[in-house]
């Protein structure tokens, strides 16, 4: 789903010299190959890592548990990494990935796309230049359709609310730099999604 979208975007980008793709399902691999016309296509990500012509790896995989080991292997092989959220399922895994990138002088970032939203970037600019004055409170609400919630729940362990609200948290923290959160409180409520994957339908989060 998302991986195919990312591959098409990369195939059409002037910043990408050659595209190499990996997909574990042969039928999906062939489908994406037809859409993107890559230099190479494989079902084993280790073939991507072993290719000396590849300098950057974009990781967009499910389940989420695969993010850490694939990103780790890429960083150890000297590849720059753009990783879709979540960075990992455990804090120590995230810490290790960040340290690996620093130790190997590699670029490593998570695909928080709201930073490239012109409205969000404009708001950050106006906060930085003082137009909006001192920001003391930010409130964000996000609403998903039931159909999108079902689609997300079918492929990830995390709740749809958690998967989407992470974008909101990121752009708020980004806009308010260099301020950092010191306390987080969150609460959820079950509903329709509970029977699908045991996740919350609604979440409230307060960050101070």
Language-model features, listed with the residues they occupy:
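A broad helix-preferring feature
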Residues: 21, 48-57
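Glycine-rich, N-terminal phosphate-binding loop of Rossmann-like dinucleotide-binding domains
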Residues: 60-62, 142
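Beta-strand-loop-alpha-helix segment that lines the small-molecule cofactor/substrate pocket
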Residues: 56, 63, 68-115, 130
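N-terminal Rossmann-like dinucleotide-binding module
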Residues: 1-36, 60, 172
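Rossmann-like dinucleotide-binding domain that binds NAD(P)(H)
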Residues: 148-208
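Rossmann-like NAD(P)H-binding beta-loop-alpha module
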Residues: 118-140, 144-149
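Conserved SAM-binding strand-loop segment of SAM-dependent methyltransferases
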Residues: 38-45
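Short, Asp-centered acidic motifs that coordinate Mg2+ and/or phosphate
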Residues: 20, 40, 56, 137
């Amino acid at each position: 789903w998302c991986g195919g979208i990312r591959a098409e975007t990369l195939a059409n980008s002037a910043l990408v010299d050659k595209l190499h793709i990996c997909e574990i399902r042969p039928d999906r691999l062939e489908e994406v190959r037809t859409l993107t016309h890559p230099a190479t296509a494989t079902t084993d990500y280790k073939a991507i890592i072993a290719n000396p012509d590849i300098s950057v790896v974009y990781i967009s995989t499910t389940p989420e548990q695969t993010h850490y080991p694939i990103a780790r292997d890429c960083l150890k092989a000297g590849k720059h990494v753009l990783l879709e959220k979540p960075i990992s399922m455990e804090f120590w895994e995230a810490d290790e990935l960040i340290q690996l990138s620093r130790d190997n002088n590699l670029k490593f970032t998570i695909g928080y796309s709201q930073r490239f939203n012109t409205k969000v970037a404009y708001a950050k600019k106006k906060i930085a230049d003082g137009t909006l004055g001192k920001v003391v409170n930010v409130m964000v609400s996000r609403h998903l359709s039931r159909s999108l919630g079902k689609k997300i729940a079918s492929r990830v362990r995390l709740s749809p609310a958690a998967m989407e609200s992470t974008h909101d948290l990121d752009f708020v923290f980004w806009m308010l730099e260099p301020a950092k959160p010191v306390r987080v409180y969150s609460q959820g409520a079950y509903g329709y999604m509970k029977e699908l994957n045991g996740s919350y339908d609604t979440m409230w989060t307060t960050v101070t």
